[in-house]
């Protein structure tokens, strides 16, 4: 996670391993002692789970101001329940974050935001070397995997998307798990204009590359959010989740989303995390044709200015 915050000069990143150094209740108290030495004046809890609640209690006991995110759990339940579903958009997560900082006395106006400056890449850097190979072709990043099956577009259909788009564009593939990397390598070996970014670059380098691409095609997953943070157009393919859950990448319109037809599968969204696939919904994602993904990607690209020249 640390590379995501390297652009900020006045920020210190504290890495926490809850499985070892900070395991259990004893580990949380150890973490609190460490953080207290930082002379913290206020705490923004943007997660609001058991661990952070314990930490908040500790900070409150020493009279440090604390505010927590309102995740809207009751509204999430109404949106994802099978019966009597309340199908209306929830407050986007970005604005929930802003609310926390506002209550701490640090108002944030996202209508007046600025995207980060793209990182400078020396000519001899590995990132610049790979970007320079694209010549005049636009670069499409594709992150075809997500944490749950319910958010993964079927691989054979994604292969059709990749096969078509790579004819006239450069494709960079992103992923992480062992099986994901194997599949990415298969696609890289199969197509001339497809490059495996995941295996060859660390997270910092991948973020640098993402900041220069022309489009990111992503599941409901992290790579779409990273790209959006740099102002890269993001096409999100939604499975068992939905934009109404509040996790659309920042500043991306609903027109940059492809969703399963709810007239055919009305239980969608089935959960906020995409981990619930109801009976009869196992093939729901196959109702999204590769042609639809390709056409939407080309539509977005035609409106986008080149970002890597």
Q: Which residues does each predicted region cover?
A:
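Catalytic machinery of carbohydrate-active enzymes
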Residues: 1-309
């Amino acid at each position: 996670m640390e590379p995501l915050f390297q652009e900020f000069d006045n920020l210190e990143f504290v890495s926490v391993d809850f499985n070892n150094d900070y395991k259990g209740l004893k580990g949380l108290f150890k973490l609190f002692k460490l953080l207290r030495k930082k002379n913290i004046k206020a705490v923004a809890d943007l997660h609001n789970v058991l661990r952070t609640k314990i930490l908040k209690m500790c900070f409150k006991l020493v009279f440090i101001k604390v505010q927590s995110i309102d995740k809207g759990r009751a509204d999430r339940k109404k949106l994802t329940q099978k019966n009597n579903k309340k199908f209306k958009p929830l407050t986007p997560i970005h604005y929930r974050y802003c609310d926390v900082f506002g209550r701490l006395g640090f108002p944030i106006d996202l209508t007046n935001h600025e995207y980060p400056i793209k990182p400078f890449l020396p000519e001899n850097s590995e990132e610049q070397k790979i970007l320079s190979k694209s010549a005049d072709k636009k670069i499409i990043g594709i992150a075809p995997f997500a944490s749950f099956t319910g958010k993964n577009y079927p691989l054979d259909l994604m292969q059709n998307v990749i096969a078509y788009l790579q004819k006239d564009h450069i494709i960079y593939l992103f992923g992480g798990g062992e099986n994901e990397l194997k599949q990415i390598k298969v696609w890289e070996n199969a197509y001339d204009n497809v490059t495996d970014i995941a295996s060859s670059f660390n997270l910092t380098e991948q973020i640098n590359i993402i900041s220069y691409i022309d489009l990111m095609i992503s599941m409901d997953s992290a790579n779409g959010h990273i790209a959006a943070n740099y102002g890269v157009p993001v096409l999100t393919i939604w499975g068992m989740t939905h934009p109404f859950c509040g996790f659309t990448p920042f500043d991306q319109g609903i027109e940059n989303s492809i969703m399963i037809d709810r007239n055919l599968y009305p239980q969608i969204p089935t959960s906020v995390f995409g981990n619930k696939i109801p009976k009869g919904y196992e093939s729901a994602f196959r109702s999204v044709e590769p042609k639809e993904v390709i056409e939407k990607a080309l539509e977005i690209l035609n409106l986008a200015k080149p970002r890597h020249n």
